[in-house]
């Protein structure tokens, strides 16, 4: 299924950046991290709480949603490629 909606505050770019420790932890460069958090916010805005508002959109699928949230929690590495993919679809 779809991952839990982080909430309107939880999808904020600043909250995401703080959670990931953008630029401080050895997770990703500040630029990559900021771009990811912005892409994540756009993703949620576009797809809605359970992907329903993004019906018919390639990006609004549970697999990508789970990947976005795993990266947003710092469970998987935020890479340039991941960011590029998210932004390409959500932008």
From Swiss-Prot:
**Recorded GO terms, molecular function?**
toxin activity
GO cellular component annotations of the record = extracellular region
List keywords of the entry alphabetically.
Cytolysis, Disulfide bond, Hemolysis, Secreted, Toxin
Disulphide bonds in the chain: 16-37, 22-33, 47-60
GO BP terms, alphabetized? killing of cells of another organism
Q: Does the record's keyword annotation contain Coiled coil? A: no
The answer to whether the entry has keyword Cell wall biogenesis/degradation is no
**Tissues expressed in:** Localized within the skin and proboscis and are most readily isolated from body mucus secretions.
Q: Tell where it localizes.
A: Secreted
Q: What biological function has been recorded for the protein in this entry?
A: Cytolysin that shows hemolytic activity (on bovine erythrocytes, HC(50)=5.75 mg/ml). This hemolytic activity is completely inhibited by small unilamelar vesicles composed of PC/PG, PC/PI and PC/PS in 1:1 molar ratios (with at least 100 mg/ml concentration).
Say which family it is in.
Belongs to the worm cytolysin family.
Its recorded name reads Parbolysin P6
Please tell me the species this chain comes from. Parborlasia corrugatus (Antarctic nemertean worm)
